[in-house]
Amino acid sequence: VKEANMEHVPYVIIGGGLAGNAAAEAIRRRDKTGRVVVICAEPHLPYDRVPLSKDYLLGKIERQQVFLKNPRFYERNTIEVLLHNPATALDVAQRHVTLANGQQLGFDKLLLATGGRPRRLAIAGAELEGIYYLRNLEDTEAIQRSLQDARRAVVIGGGFIGCELAAGFAQLGLQTTVVELTPALLSLVVDPETSAFIMSYLQQQGVTILTDTAATEFMGAQGRVRAVATNTGREIAADLVAVGVGIAL
C-alpha cells in the first residue's frame, strides 16, 4: 500500500548520464506539462563522460564544458534533477522508488539508465594509493593530481578506456605501459586490422604494450603503488596505475 504522503511523478528517470538526460529531453518535447524527475547519484548535473579520458584529462577543455546542459536548461524545461541522492530501493509492483534520503516517489513510467561501475581487480595490493578507476569527474581529477608527480604509468586493460588513457599519458610525457590479458588490444570490440592499427599508433607514441599478460599484484611502499607484477614474471615500475577492465552492472 502506498503511503498517503508519497509524491507521485508521471516520469521518473534513474541515472543522470547521457541516456537519462536525453530521455528527459525527449519526454519534455512530447509532454510539455508532465512532471519529470531525474535521480542522480552524483553531486553534478548530467555530464558527458566521453571527454574524461581524453580532452578533459589533458586539460584541453574546462570543467564546465563537460556538462550536457547549463542549469537554466533544466529550470526552463521544468526538469527536476535530484543530485547526490541515489535510488536505494525499487518496488515495481507498487510502482515507487526510495531514495537515499528516505524520500519515496511513486511513478507512472520509470526508466533505468544507471550504466555500470568499473570492475575492480581483486589482487594483492589493490588497496594501495595511486590506483585509479575512471568513471566520473572526480576520478579524472584525482588522476590529474597524481600526474603532477608521476613519470611512469601502467594501464591495465587494453579496451577503449585503457587505450585512451595510455595515449593521454604518453602525450603528457609519461613512460607508459599497457598490460592486456588477451592477444590484442580491443580484441572483443574491433576487427584485427583496427586492433593492429591502434597498437601501432600507441607504440609510435612510445607506449609499451604487453599482450597475453595479466597483472597479479600491486606492489607498494609507504602505502602507495610502486610497481605492477605480472604472470610473466615482470615487475613494471609505476608512479600511478589506471585500471580499465570492463564494468560491473
Where are these regions (language model features)?
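Hydrophobic residues in beta-strands of the RecA-like P-loop NTPase core, especially within AAA+ ATPase
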Residues: V155-I156, V179
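Glycine-rich, highly charged phosphate/nucleotide-binding loops
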Residues: C163
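Walker A/P-loop nucleotide-binding motif
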Residues: G159-F160
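Alpha-helical scaffold segments in soluble metabolic enzymes
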Residues: A22, A26, A142, G168, ...
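Short, flexible helix/strand-to-coil boundary loops that buttress conserved ligand/catalytic motifs
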Residues: R49-V50, G125, L147, V189-V190, ...
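A Rossmann-like FAD-binding core segment of flavoenzymes
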Residues: T33, V81-T98, L105, L172-L249
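FAD-binding core/adjacent interface of flavoenzyme oxidoreductases
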Residues: V1-V12, V37, N70-V154, A227-E235, ...
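Beta1-alpha1 glycine-rich phosphate/pyrophosphate-binding loop at the start
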Residues: E7-E80, A166-V189, E193
